[in-house]
Amino acid sequence: TWAHGNSGDFAPTYYLQTDAPLYYYSFTDAYIARAFQKLKPAQQARLDPMITGFNPADMYAADHIRRVLETFPGVFTGIGEFTIHKEFVSSKVAGDTASLTDPALDRILEFAGEVGLVVILHNDIDMPFAKAGAEPVYLTQMKDLLRRHPRTTIIWAHTGLGRVVHPVQPQAGAEVAERSPNHIEILQTMLDDPTLAHVSFDISWDEVAKYAVSSPAAIDRLSQLLNAYPDRFLFGTDNVAPNDQATQMRVYDLWNPIWAKLTPEASRKVRLGTYERLFDAARGNVRAWEVANVK
């Protein structure tokens, strides 16, 4: 919202630039679709537009997604990134608060599974400034949600991290450490869980990179995890409307200490292969659904 009483003549373009409420701008889906349709086929083939203009706390959200597909067949591959719990954002959204237990979210994920849409979901694993030694507040609810939708391809954005939602670290002492695994152990447990085989993780955002390369030990832990499960991770920059390629490469280069420790096969899968596999499959599934359902 551009609230003149809050920011005056300054027009905010990012959620941190204003204290005014945020709202879901549904026209974004039509705007993206029209822009995509103006591209040449060779350009379209390089893009996977995503539906984002829905309120995940609204029981009509799944209907909105269906209408977008019916109105613009041949365009969209998935939904997201959309947000449930996010530091500095959730409290600013006008209307009902989104929740991992809201049936509106279940309707969204159920419909995505029916169509074959890939889902990118941002949900902080914990509250900001959480105390060490405690289980992340939203971890159990998140896993329960993921298990309720085994037919839906879901990507947990940023592995649940944020600007101040940092990786879980156990307190000193074996007893506490045993009760509270660190972030890498949480991810590994989820990766080994057969009920979560449909879930992948993206390592996009420079805020995630700062945790990944924060120390030699952190670099070693994450690179070992990526080498062991390269089919479950996707790299991305998470840049918002970058002006040039250098802006994109700045985030990519932050990961150089990690890239240096990956096997060639794992490196390619994390940087490109996992994305191609998930999104190419989703694109084919969505097009098939549109042929069968859009009249």
Residue ranges and their predicted role:
Residues F54-D58, I84-E87, I125-P128, G160-R163, ...:
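Solvent-exposed loop/turn segments at secondary-structure junctions
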Residues I79, A112, H158, F201, ...:
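Divalent metal-coordination and catalytic microenvironments
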Residues Q44, R151, T195, A260-K269:
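Structural helix-adjacent loops and short alpha-helical linkers that scaffold large soluble proteins
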Residues G74-T77, P194, D231, E265:
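Structured loop/turn residues at beta-strand edges in well-structured enzyme cores
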Residues T1, V208, Q224-L234, N239-K295:
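Mid-to-C-terminal alpha-helical segments outside catalytic/metal-binding sites
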Residues K40, A94-F235:
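Catalytic pocket-lining loop regions of alpha/beta-barrel enzymes
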Residues W2-E135:
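Active-site gating/metal-coordination segments in enzymes
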Residues A62, S91-V93, A132-G133, H166-P170, ...:
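Short aromatic-enriched loop/helix-cap "lid" or pocket-rim segments at secondary-structure transitions
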